[in-house]
Amino acid sequence: TWMKNAAKRGARIVLADPRITDIGRHAWRTLQFKADADVAMLNALIHTVIDEGLVDEAFINDRANNFEALKANVMGCSPEAMAPVCGIPAETLREVARAFATAKASMILWGMGVSQHIHGTDNARCLIALCAVTGQIGKPGSGLHPLRGQNNVQGASDAGLIPMMFPNYQRVDNAGAHAWFEEFWGTQLDEAPGYTVVEIMHKALAPDSDPHKVRGMYIMGENPAMSDPDLNHARHALGSLSHLVVQDIFLTETAWLADVVLPASAWPEKTGTASNTDRMVQMGRRALNPPGDARPDLWIIQQIAQRVGPHAPHFVSSLPPEGAGPALGRPGGGAGLNWNYEGEESGVAAVYEEMRQAMHASIEGITWDRLERESSVTYPCLAPDDPGQPIVFTDQFPTPTGRLQLVPASVIPAAEKPSAEFPFVLITGRQLEHWHTGSMTRRSTVLDAIEPMATASLHGDELARLGVQPGALVGIRSRRGMVQVRVRRDDGTPRGTVFMPFAYVEAAANLLTNAALDPFGKIPEFKYCAVAVEALPSTKGD
């Protein structure tokens, strides 16, 4: 893999994770911090950089605001003070901070372990601050790289598939952005941000008197009956709907609850683009026809639009020539919504052209014809002859001042701490063989043969204390639910902690998780909740 090859070439990899995973074998140093102590650990690193005179003064003076507030905030966060909080020796924290600050280039890559906490936004703010105070932004080999959850999450976010954003990360409640998109689409747009997934589930169970009660859902390519926190609550919400439509390539657990299932096509069965975390817009070409009644998502959406009702406004069917200004969405007369676009594959090239105009500040120079020739182009790319900019933030940031705003973060405990009744911390996540909720990988006979059943990983000392052997059946219980699962010995999992993948419907880890949200990003705390682990009578001592 990329990381292993980098280690072989001499790159110093630091693994920061409550669990020691396989990549730890290739790491120069491992920071195995306590599961909710991200901010404590990161503030200690920032403190060391400032305390030992390793700050990139030119970067801070020329390109960042609020440094003095950040400095004051971490004043009491020395490695010696934070070591008992985060569980990492002070000298190790100092060593890693020095190495990060003095390297020619340092970068940070992170996954869902950073964001899936009630302090997930603060975790990200600390990572940004660490890169800023060391000047590790805007130069080759540096920067912050959030590894997105799956293919084209980046592209979907870029295109505005976020409840509080228009395309290109223009806020819905920003008056200027709102006016621009109303003119672009030729229609009135709601001024209020939408709900996130967990908030939608709450609204599905709201009283009938709530004017914002959710009574129906149309779910595409998502499996919230497995992926949402506190699944008993989420499944109850889905089951209470007046109407549920699920559009997916397989009959998922969510589809089991649906009134209507629309069979969609898989990635090789449609043409379109995907963007990754490196900001590469990539062309994907249809290689196969969809099986049976399955159809591409775009075709399904267009057919639904045509049938929404006789009094719906009519929309123009194609974009005007480039440079002539937007026209799609101007109301006319007629029945239904005409969301058809001219061209092959349901007009996918015209849809992309609309997106290119909506995201003109990022992908204006990446035309459909260019993608067909080059297959992928990196953005920002603002002209047809622009090769794309693989390095961003070289001289300014996309803020009103062009400068980075540093935001101090304080240590915030998890929403739910262990207790005498629930003494373990549960961490959920993925595993190598099964992706997310397993809707695809568990249908792969090879992968399912390698990992055919749900397991819970515990340290060997915890198995001994419970009086069970690897492979024994245990009950894991939280304040929200209980599952029975086989245990696996994993000494990389810290004592007092359980790790479970969430891919298995027969032992759905999210029956246990807490729906507490980060107040800014509105992401649930999948990475921390309190549970009890109990040896079942029939297996204890086996």
Task: State where each predicted segment sits.
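Extended redox/cofactor-interaction regions of prokaryotic respiratory oxidoreductases
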Residues: 1-4, 11-16, 39-43, 84, ...
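Long, well-ordered, tryptophan-enriched scaffold segments
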Residues: 7-14, 19-103
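Short beta-alpha connecting loops at secondary-structure transitions
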Residues: 25-33, 263-265, 269, 280-291, ...
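Short, well-ordered loop/turn and helix-capping segments at boundaries between secondary-structure elements
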Residues: 47, 51, 132-139, 240-243, ...
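Flexible, glycine/charged-enriched surface loops at secondary-structure junctions
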Residues: 55-60, 107, 138-145, 312-322, ...
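Glycine-rich phosphate/diphosphate-binding loops that line cofactor/substrate pockets in enzymes
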Residues: 73, 94-107, 200-215
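C-terminal, active-site-flanking charged/polar segments
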Residues: 240-243, 249-272, 277-283, 473, ...
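Long, contiguous, secondary-structure-rich segments that constitute the structural scaffold
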Residues: 291-374, 437, 441-457, 461-542
